[in-house]
């Protein structure tokens, strides 16, 4: 894979448990670990954004940085234009967490 390709990485999801009675109290998803080599370009900014149900964001284009996305609640479909001009629809959800990498100079929404 090249640095200009749109990539997806299936993420692990692990239940977390209460320390007293061991009931499941949530989940944890490791998004990035340096030994996994899932992020090809070193992040220079990290932020969280949200989208209300039924709403959309974009399309937009970042000219100087890669973008990485993962859905932590609900479900989202990312739409990105690849090097061939084709549109990709990539789904990520709390049940099926996928890290989406959009390289610079690729339109996405």
Regions found by a protein language model. Name each.
Residues 1-99:
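Non-catalytic, conserved peripheral segments adjacent to functional cores
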Residues 95-109:
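Well-ordered alpha/beta subsegment
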């Amino acid at each position: 894979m090249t640095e200009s390709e749109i990539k997806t990485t299936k993420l692990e999801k692990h239940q977390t448990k209460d320390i007293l009675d061991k009931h499941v109290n949530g989940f944890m998803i490791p998004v990035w670990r340096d030994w996994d080599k899932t992020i090809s370009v070193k992040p220079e900014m990290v932020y969280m954004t949200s989208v209300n149900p039924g709403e959309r964001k974009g399309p937009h284009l970042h000219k100087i940085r890669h973008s990485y996305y993962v859905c932590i609640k609900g479900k989202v479909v990312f739409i990105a234009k690849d090097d061939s001009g084709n549109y990709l629809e990539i789904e990520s959800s709390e049940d099926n967490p996928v890290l989406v990498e959009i390289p610079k100079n690729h339109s996405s929404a």
